[in-house]
């Protein structure tokens, strides 16, 4: 059974939600945008008989309110957040880290800074390297000009109208692998969630800053030299094409035909198997 709890990180003035299930070696899962900890429920159910699975809402997503302006979404701040959560829930042993999408950016930075706390890493459909040609809406979200900020604000507001109908229509076209249940969940947790939408704009303005990915090559090398690492990548991803599956540098790369961007939702059993393989390495 998956248990949820809310924790307050006083040192960061942040409240977040943590989901846990099972006992055993720890699997720590980082969600992407525009998702939250619920992304990992199906994977956790697959693993809970052998592992202690832990995931969290990054600040501003899911049931975590938008953080104060003092939290900048820099890699340094996000590493501090992860460390604070792990301290609060008393995680003291090395973990198997599983990352997706924007969670891969945070996860790569955290893992590289904490190889002694890392047992292995599994990467799925993420951007953790320099030179990625960002899609148009991400570029707009990251644009700090007044006109772009206004367009982004209006666009985010429109996504929540009529129960997120516009969002669901757009997202269904971008992610045809997702069913109506997941589209409804995204509409509720993101399109109708003002905190999550404001957080997205704040986060992408940080991601798009020159030099954000400057040190990622060195980070990846540090991780690959320290622990087992595998990539499991959903093909037919409209956001991050399959050619980037090899960009992280892992020797073991599995491509899932037509699984799309959200492997944790479309192929949780395959992802769980990859995690178990890393645990046995």
Where are the model-predicted features located?
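Asparagine-centered polar/low-complexity signal
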Residues: 33-36, 100, 125, 272
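Two-component system phosphotransfer/interaction surface
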Residues: 272-276, 280
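Generic recognition of short, well-ordered alpha-helical segments
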Residues: 38, 42, 109, 243, ...
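Short alpha-helical
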Residues: 25, 35, 42, 105, ...
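Conserved residues at beta->alpha junctions
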Residues: 31-34, 235, 266
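Conserved HGGG/HGGXW glycine-rich cap/lid loop of the alpha/beta-hydrolase fold
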Residues: 17-65
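Flexible "cap/lid" subdomain of the alpha/beta-hydrolase fold that forms the substrate-access gate
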Residues: 2-6, 12, 16-18, 54, ...
């Amino acid at each position: 059974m998956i248990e949820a709890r809310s924790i307050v990180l006083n040192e960061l003035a942040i409240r977040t939600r943590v989901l846990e299930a099972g006992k055993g070696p720890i699997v720590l899962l980082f969600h992407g945008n525009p998702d939250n900890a619920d992304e990992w429920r199906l994977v956790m159910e697959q693993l809970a008989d052998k592992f202690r699975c832990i995931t969290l809402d990054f600040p501003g997503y899911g049931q975590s309110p938008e953080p104060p302006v003092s939290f900048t979404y820099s890699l340094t701040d996000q590493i501090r957040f992860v460390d604070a959560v792990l301290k609060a829930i008393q995680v003291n042993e090395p973990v198997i880290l599983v990352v997706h999408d924007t969670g891969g950016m945070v996860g790569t930075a955290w893992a590289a800074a904490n190889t002694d706390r890392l047992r292995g890493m599994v990467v799925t459909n993420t951007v953790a390297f320099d030179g990625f040609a960002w899609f148009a809406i991400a570029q707009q979200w990251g644009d700090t000009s007044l006109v772009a900020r206004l367009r982004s604000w209006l666009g985010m507001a429109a996504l929540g109208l009529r129960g997120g109908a516009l969002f669901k229509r757009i997202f269904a076209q971008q992610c045809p692998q997702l069913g109506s249940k997941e589209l409804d969940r995204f509409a509720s947790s993101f399109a109708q969630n003002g905190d999550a939408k404001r957080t997205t704009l704040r986060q992408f303005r940080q991601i798009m800053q020159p030099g954000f990915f400057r040190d990622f090559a060195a980070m990846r090398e540090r991780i690959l030299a320290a622990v087992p690492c595998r990539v499991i990548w959903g093909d037919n991803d409209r956001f991050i094409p399959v050619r980037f599956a090899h960009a992280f540098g892992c020797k073991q790369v599995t491509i899932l035909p037509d699984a799309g961007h959200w492997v944790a939702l479309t192929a949780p059993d395959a992802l769980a198997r990859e995690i178990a393989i890393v645990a046995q390495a």
